[in-house]
Each structure stands twice: as C-alpha cells, then as structure tokens.
Amino acid sequence: MTSFSNAAGTSTLAAGLASALSETDEGKVLLVDVNLGPGEVHPFFKGKPAYPLAKALEQSGPIDAAADNLYLATIGSAKSGPAQLGLKRFFDLMPNLKASDFDYIIFDMPPLGPTSPTWSLSPFMDKMLLIVQSDTTNKEVVNRGYSKLIRERENVSVVFNKAQSYGPKWISGEE
C-alpha cells in the first residue's frame, strides 16, 4: 500500500486491512511498516510491540501477536536514516517472505516520490493499492505515478480516500 503524500491515510488503511483480515480466521497476517527514517517507524500498534522483519520471519521462535492472527514488523528502526538500512535487508529477506508462516503480508510503504524506495519494492508485491487523497492529489501526478507502477507490475488498484459528498444526503441515499 502506498500513496502520493503522508496524509493520504495509507497507514490507517493498511492497519485496518490487516486487522480485518486477521479477524476472518483464515490465516496469519503480518503488517510491515516500511516507512523508514527517524520518527516515521511506529514500534507499537495499539500498545503491542512491532518486531524487526527479520525476527518476524524467523522460524525459530514465536513472536507476540498484536491481536489474534495479527503480527507487526518494521523494516528499519527509529534511529535509521532514509532507506539505506532497510532496503538491503528487505531484498535479503525476500526468499523468507515466500516461505514464511504468514498467509497475508501487508506492506505500509512510503509515499511515491522521485527517490521513494516504493518504486523498487513494488515489483515484488502481489498486489499494489495506490491510495489517492481526493482533495489534494493532482490528477497528472496520479496518472504519471499509476502509469509507472503499471509498467513495473500489472496488479495495481487505486483507492480513492477522504472523498466528500457536497450534494444533499438524500441523493446519495444516506437518509
């Protein structure tokens, strides 16, 4: 999951999707925070610890679940700088992701930008969700970003977030 800005709601949607999938009892879900850099990594989710991705993928020992069937991991640490630390580790761990015990792995990735690590990670994802903030994201930026993602990976969907209805509620069936 990614977006074009920090305020598009990507982390909220990623956490919500992971939580919803974990409640179906159809498998284990790993939510991975890929937002690298000081102050951007969230070591806790609802008071539960997030583990380094390498530890979450280890077969040797169990990690604590944040909720039933929901586990949390980060690629970097709060002390690490932008992308340099985590991405090398991520690519080293790729074989372990496929062999892990998790049925769903959701990546909360940094916003797309000229130097965003998300461009490099997107080809490895089974599905990309591109979050578009309805009132602030420029149409041309969306078209260019979507086209570039489609060239890298065919399975990209757009989620239109924070949409507002300005018409009467009875028109949209809200009353």
Which residues fall in each region the model found?
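P-loop/Walker-type NTP enzyme "switch/lid" segment
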Residues: 2-8, 27-104, 111-124
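Hydrophobic positions on the alpha1 helix immediately C-terminal to the Walker A/P-loop
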Residues: 12-13
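Active-site signature of alpha/beta-hydrolase-fold catalytic machinery across serine-
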Residues: 16, 20, 43
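Short glycine-/polar-rich loops that comprise or flank the Walker A/P-loop
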Residues: 26-27, 125-127, 152-156
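Structural beta-sheet core signal
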Residues: 31, 72, 107, 130, ...
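Beta-strand-loop-alpha "switch" segments that mediate conformational coupling across diverse proteins
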Residues: 76, 108, 134, 159-167
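Conserved Switch II/interswitch segment of TRAFAC-class P-loop GTPases
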Residues: 111-114, 125-142
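Hydrophobic micro-sites
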Residues: 140-175
